[in-house]
């Protein structure tokens, strides 16, 4: 796996403030980052630019995170991109659904600091 500076992280998050916090934290760690503020933009960005990993909110405008994840996992060019769901939905049904559709992890925003999210990404990409 490449070093941090060659790793491209796509953050799909409609909360602009929160997206900026994650973006700055990843950039401080040397990652290349882009942000999409709705599900349709996130899917389009993933299909065009093939990020190394995607952080995906579930409650998104235009297309929810579950629908984005399903489309990513059914696409020939995107099915192998690891996706971490990063959301406020903490019900067991939501966690189970996200993992069943193909997410590699499911993080509840309130339970993880941005630095811990970066650590999770590093672990998934074998950079830790």
Q: Predicted segment positions?
A:
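The feature encodes the CheY-like receiver
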Residues: 19, 61, 70, 79, ...
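The short loop immediately C-terminal to the conserved phospho-acceptor aspartate in CheY-like receiver
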Residues: 32, 58-59, 73, 84-85
